[in-house]
Amino acid sequence: SIDHNQSQSETDEKSIEVKLSATPAILGKTLKEDTSLISDASKFSQILKKEFEIVNFAEKIKKLLQKIEIRKIFICLDDCSELDQEALDMFVRTIVAPLHNDSDGFFRFKIAFYPERNTLPDIDRSKIDTYMLDYYHLYKSSGADKVEEQAISYVKRLIRQRIKHYFNESNVSDIESTLFDTKPMSIDDYYKLIFYIASSIPRNIGKVLFYAERKSISQGKPITKTVLQESSEEQYENDISPILTKDEFFQYKSYGENFKRSQLLSLMNKIIEKAKENKQKIGTSNSNIFKDYTTSNAPSHYLFIKRENELFLSTLEINFFITRISEQKDKGDYKNNKFISNDIIVYTINYGLCQKENIIYDKPNNRKYRIERLFDYNKLIEEWVNNSA
């Protein structure tokens, strides 16, 4: 965060103390009266814009750059979601919006946000391009049956490009067979497993391969399926679980989050408990769709909710406790002598968490499997909300 105190000497009329921090504030004091704390970001940003004259400053820079025939400036802002909502709101109002709204578009912004942790005040969203980079939204236009295929292809291309770069080898297949034990399992199955573990997120792919390297390659052994599974659990324990279990700053909660860390931990524990119960139910079920499973191999990592309950899971989703894999219709509720389908979102529980809790993570070929009624978590979510209020 930024902590900075700036005081103006008292004049006959007023003195102002400005404090910039993770939760900016203005303290104003006149000779006649003390004013109360002003937390409205728009008022504060108006003061900053007048003080720093960002538009005039940018105009001078633009004229200088145009003299050397520079026509556009692209400003890339990464990890803006690390700011709290008030600070981000103020930054956008003060810096981004005035430059973005410039009539000739000389300054162009590319801004990275986490879902549910973004705000763009004073900017018309209908006039900007927005790209969702989670694999479901990125590839869903290819068709529901192609989403996973496209995401796995991305993982494969990403890793193979890294192999080409770091090993300077044209024969990538030889390097792959050296890094991975391809005797019991094909290289494509390894890429599929890495996709399940990391959900096509480059940072998570890098982390799980880092843990895998320490367990295998650094000891002169190739990466195996078991190594990747153990690494997924280690990554979960080290990088994801502490978000709900440690007392450190809870950085990536949704801006609309109304529940405490302890309450979200309770929700996650309830999800885990139900997944374990579902594993037993599937393994002992007489239903035809579950006939190939026992209590030791029944996949129970799915859950789905109605779209109106999405907000309650947003913080868990952006922190990778769960991952969205589909938006579709459920089997429906029986009303007025007919079944009426609901719009639902289907998630999977984090692969490393499944390893830790002995929840079977698998991908049955039957797409109807994941919307079986036992994966309906709406009642669980609604009861948790009522008990947490």
What are these regions (language model features)?
Residues 1-53, 85:
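Conserved P-loop NTPase mechanochemical-coupling segment
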Residues 3-19, 23-26, 151-162, 256-276:
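Low-complexity, serine/threonine/proline-enriched polar segments
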Residues 42-187, 232:
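The catalytic "switch" region of P-loop NTPases
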Residues 61-64, 96-99, 192-195, 301, ...:
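Generic recognition of flexible, low-complexity loop/linker segments
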Residues 74, 110-113, 195-213:
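Short, hydrophobic, well-ordered secondary-structure elements
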Residues 90, 150, 154, 189, ...:
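Generic recognition of stable, solvent-exposed alpha-helical segments in well-folded globular domains
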Residues 178-196, 208-211:
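A long, hydrophobic alpha-helical segment
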Residues 197-200, 204, 214, 221-389:
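C-terminal leucine-rich, beta-strand-based interaction scaffolds used for sensing/assembly
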